[in-house]
Amino acid sequence: MFDIKITKEPIVFFDCSYYIFHRYFATKRWISFQKDTENINFLEAFERHFENDLNKLCKKFKTTRSNMYFGVDCYRNTIWRNEYLKTYKQHRVENPEFDRDIFDYFKTTIKDKFNLKLINCDNLEADDVIAIIHKEITNKVNNIIIITNDSDYVQLKNDKTTIINMQLKDITLKHNLKNYTIYKALIGDKSDNIKRVGKITKATADKIIQKPTNEIYEWLKENELLTEYNNNIRIIDFNYIPEELINNLLSNINII
């Protein structure tokens, strides 16, 4: 059983994969500017900057490390969305400059050293994990911070939730929040290999989402695009996470 304690201070959720990528390349960049690079231990530098990040965020948001949680991805070939889109995320190209061993190091050595709270569940991506918990606690807390650079999280934006990247930039500002999931389902997501609906462009989608929801569905039906849209929205909208997986995660979490 994993405890999530509700406090007066903000609760911070990290998309674990995003953070590791960010810190990995930020550490490499930092090392490149040092004079004696040969005598710098990468993992020691990574850990030192990781701790600095935690301290900086605690100070920025007036919270404590005990209020920080990391959402962890399941294995890509076990993601529940694969059942609905066989090519989901299949076209992602590995960065040859990135050493994936840092994931295991973070989830074991760094986790134990800093007593990190990593949350994962079979078949769920990190954003699924965070979305499910977010829904459970959003009416019980004063402030939630989500740290990511993934626009999928934009749908979690509300008056109590701030969604930022590690540069502390609000990633929701560049998006139209009105009917956001509908918009994203219409235009697709190349990074996840989700194709757009028909030949709808971003400009067309911007116009469509101004309509009342019932008119949007009527328009899609009239143009024989409703099936494509439904296929996309099922993958994109967190409300379509299978109930069984939601229950699996929540059965192992105690919100106190």
Features from the language model and the residues they span:
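Extended two-metal-dependent nuclease catalytic cores across DNA- and RNA-processing enzymes
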Residues: 1-4, 37, 64, 90-255
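Domain-level signal for Mg2+-assisted phosphodiester chemistry and nucleotide/NA-binding surfaces
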Residues: 1-108
